[in-house]
Each structure stands twice: as structure tokens, then as C-alpha cells.
A protein has these predicted regions:
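Divalent metal-dependent catalytic cores for phosphoryl transfer on phosphate-bearing substrates
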Residues: 16-19, 44-130
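Short alpha-helical hairpin
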Residues: 1-13
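Short acidic/polar alpha-helix capping motifs at helix-coil junctions
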Residues: 2-4, 41-46
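A positional/architectural concept
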Residues: 14-20, 24-44, 55
Length: 130
């Protein structure tokens, strides 16, 4: 794996099972990906968004949530740490900000982290909410 690669959907699924995500958390993550990709696919032509990065970060944003239910660790921080150790640096940066967003610039260009953050807030459990 090259440094800072983005895992494929198959690699994301393998990680989901390797780290024993609960079925309800998997379902939530899949819905977050659906919303994220719906946003990404409907952006104004020419908007520079890495669709693969959005998909991977959406699927993996709760990668350590199952274990955090027992350890009480912050799953955004532990998930980012795990993904950095695996070499997925850009995915890790998005995962780390899906709970507490930082450095938002309303006038700036849209970023992948904003899409995943927003999509996660629009999905409660496995339902899309307004």
C-alpha cells in the first residue's frame, strides 16, 4: 500500500468486519455513504471532490465505535488513530472531524470532510432525517 492511500469499497468492508462493527453501526455507515455520495454526485460540475475519499470516510467514520461503547474512548479520535496506523491519512483526518468539526470556512471551497460531517448528521441510526 502506498502512503496515504484510500481504501477501496472492498477494503473498507474488510476493515468493517476485521474491527467487528455492530450490524446497526454498519447500516448507519452505509446510509451515511449513500447521503454523502448523493451530495457528491449532485454538485455543480467542476467542484473538486474526491468521490472515493468521501465513500471510504463515510463507511469508516465509526470504525471504532463498537469498541468505544465498552472502552468509553472517543471513537472519532481512536478511529482516526487506527486509520493513520493503517496508512489512510486523508480518511483519518475526515474521521477525526466527523463529531467535532474544526476550522470551518464558510466562504471556502467545499471539502470532503464537510460532506461526510453533514451526511452523518442527516442519518440517525439507519434513517435519513431532516
Amino acid at each position: 500500500m502506498k502512503p496515504d492511500s484510500i481504501p477501496s469499497l472492498d477494503e473498507c468492508r474488510a476493515l468493517i468486519y476485521r474491527y467487528s462493527m455492530r450490524p446497526n453501526i454498519i447500516e448507519h455507515s452505509m446510509r451515511v455513504m449513500d447521503v454523502s455520495l448523493a451530495i457528491t454526485d449532485n454538485l455543480v460540475p467542476g467542484t473538486r471532490i474526491d468521490r472515493d475519499l468521501v465513500a471510504a470516510a463515510s463507511l469508516l467514520h465509526d470504525i471504532t465505535k463498537t469498541r468505544s461503547l465498552e472502552t468509553k474512548e472517543r471513537h472519532d479520535v481512536s478511529g482516526a488513530r487506527l486509520l493513520r496506523e493503517l496508512g489512510y491519512l486523508r480518511v483519518a483526518d475526515i474521521v477525526e472531524q466527523h463529531v467535532f468539526f474544526r476550522d470551518f470556512s464558510p466562504g471556502g471551497a467545499l471539502e470532503e470532510r464537510e460532506i461526510v460531517y453533514y451526511a452523518d448528521k442527516r442519518v440517525m441510526h439507519n434513517a435519513i432525517v431532516t
